[in-house]
């Protein structure tokens, strides 16, 4: 159960959140290009 405690620490959660956000932005840019520039 030590792994679960490690996975819930702040740096790990922040890293996962950054990867998730970057992945969503990349996929949005792939399907809808130039949507970030009006």
From Swiss-Prot:
Membrane topology: Single-pass membrane protein
Transmembrane segments: 6-26
Keyword Transport: no
InterPro entries in the record: PSI_PsaJ (IPR002615), PSI_PsaJ_sf (IPR036062)
Biological role stated in the UniProt entry: May help in the organization of the PsaE and PsaF subunits.
Compartments, as annotated in UniProt: Plastid, Chloroplast thylakoid membrane
Keywords: Chloroplast, Membrane, Photosynthesis, Photosystem I, Plastid, Thylakoid, Transmembrane, Transmembrane helix
Gene: psaJ
Pfam family, one: PSI_PsaJ
Cited SUPFAM superfamilies: Subunit IX of photosystem I reaction centre, PsaJ (SSF81544)
Protein name in the entry: Photosystem I reaction center subunit IX
Organism: Cyanidioschyzon merolae (strain NIES-3377 / 10D)
GO terms under biological process: photosynthesis
Family of this protein: Belongs to the PsaJ family.
One cellular component (GO) term of this entry: chloroplast thylakoid membrane
Presence of the UniProt keyword tRNA-binding in the record: no
